[in-house]
Amino acid sequence: MQNKKSHYIWLFLVIFVPALILYFNKVKLGLDLRGGTSVVLQAQGKIEADTMSKVRNIIERRVNSIGVAEPVIQLSGNDKLIVELAGIKDPQKAIELIGTTAKLEFRIKNKDGSYGPVLLEGSALKSAGVSRDQVGMPSVSFELNSQGANTFAKITRENIGKQLAIMLDNKEQSAPTINSEINGGSGIITGRFSMEEANNLANLLKSGALPVEIKIVENRTVGATLGVDSIKQTGIAGLIALGVISVFMIAIYKIPGIVADIALLINGVLVLGLLSGIGAALTLPGIAGFILTLGMAVDSNVITYERIKEELRLGESLHDAVERGYENAFPAIIDGNITTLLVAAVLFFLGTGPIKGFAVTLSLGVVATIITGVFVSKVILKLFIKTFNIKREQLFWKGALNED
C-alpha cells in the first residue's frame, strides 16, 4: 500500500513540477520562431587559450549596450562565436557594432598625410560617452586612466603644432591640431557624426577592443512575420500528428491506448518543462526533435502493450500480465532510447546552431520518453484497472488476445 502511495506521489510530481515551471517561466522561442538576426563570427590569426572568452565578454557588453532582450552568445569550436539577437529593429546596425574590432589608436599625422607610430592605445581608456563639440554637433568624449593621462600629456607636450590623429581600426576619425599640453586625460573625438553614429562609437569604446580581428562568416536574418507563420504551421502539423496518433492507439489498443495518449500529453509537458527549466530556446529543428520523441514515446508503449498481450495469452492474471509486460519491455525501451541519446550527444557536441537545438530537444525528449514509457504509463494503467474495475478480457478490444 505504501509503495502504491509513493508511485502516485511521484506521478503527481512528474506532472505538477514541469507544469509549474511552464506557468512561471515560459519556453523561450528561438530566432527562427520569433524573428531576429544570427551572426557567426570567426577569429582571424593566432588565438590564445583565453582569446575567445575575451571576445565573448566584449561582444556581450556591446550587445547589452543596444538593449537586446535575452541575447544568445555562445562559443562554437576553438575560433567561432555564435550571436543570436531576437526581435531587433535594425539588424544592420547590430551587425556593424558586433563585427567591428574597435581598435583605438593615437598617432601623429604627418604633413604628407601619412601617420607616425602608435603613441597611445584604447587599452588606456577609462570611459567614453556622447557629447557635443563647440558648434553643437554630436561627438564622443573620452577619459583616460592615470597612466594613459600621463602618456597623453607627454604626447601633447612634445607635439605642439602637430595634428594628433585618432584612429579606429586604422581609419581616421578626427585629427585635431595640438595647441598646448593637455592634462587630466580627457578629450573629444569629432567627425561630423550623427547622434546614432556617436552613440555607436561611444559604445564600442566603452566595451573595449577585441583582442583579435574577427570576420563575419555567416549572417542570417529572420523576419518576425516568418516566425509567426512558422509557429502556426508547426503547431497545426503537431496537432494533426497528435490527433492521428491518439486515434490510432485507441483503435488498436483500447484502454491501454487511452493511457498511452494521456502519457503522451504528460510527455509533452515534461519536455517543455525541462526546456524551460534549463533555459533552452525552442527552435524549428527543436520542434522536429520534439515531434520525433512523441513518436518514440508511442513506440515504447506499443512494445509494452504487445508484451502484456503475450502474457495474457499465456494465461497470466491481469495484474501479473501488466507487471511482466512492463518488465519484459524495459530492456528494449532502454536500449532504443540510449542509442538515440548517444546520437543526440554527438549532434550537440559536433553541430552548431539549429543542429544543437534539435539535439537538445531530442535528448530531453528521450529522457521524458523513458520516464513516461517505463513509469508514468504503468501507474496510470494500474489506476485505470483499479478505478474502473477492468477485467482481463476488457483491457483490449475483443479478439485481440486470439491473434497469432
From Swiss-Prot:
GO cellular component, one term: plasma membrane
Residue ranges the record marks as coiled coil: none
Transmembrane segments: 7-27, 239-259, 262-282, 283-303, 330-350, 357-377
Membrane topology: Multi-pass membrane protein
Keyword terms of this UniProt record: Cell inner membrane, Cell membrane, Membrane, Protein transport, Translocation, Transmembrane, Transmembrane helix, Transport
Keyword match Transmembrane: yes
Cellular compartments annotated: Cell inner membrane
GO annotation, biological process: intracellular protein transmembrane transport; protein targeting; protein transport by the Sec complex
GO molecular function term, any single one: protein-transporting ATPase activity
The keyword Chaperone appears for this protein: no
PANTHER family: PROTEIN TRANSLOCASE SUBUNIT SECD, PROTEIN-EXPORT MEMBRANE PROTEIN SEC
Its biological purpose: Part of the Sec protein translocase complex. Interacts with the SecYEG preprotein conducting channel. SecDF uses the proton motive force (PMF) to complete protein translocation after the ATP-dependent function of SecA.
Self-association state and partner proteins as the record states: Forms a complex with SecF. Part of the essential Sec protein translocation apparatus which comprises SecA, SecYEG and auxiliary proteins SecDF. Other proteins may also be involved.
Family that this chain belongs to: Belongs to the SecD/SecF family. SecD subfamily.
Record-given protein name: Protein translocase subunit SecD
Species assigned in the record: Leptotrichia buccalis (strain ATCC 14201 / DSM 1135 / JCM 12969 / NCTC 10249 / C-1013-b)
Highest classification ranks of the organism: Bacteria, Fusobacteriati, Fusobacteriota, Fusobacteriia, Fusobacteriales
Gene giving rise to this polypeptide: secD
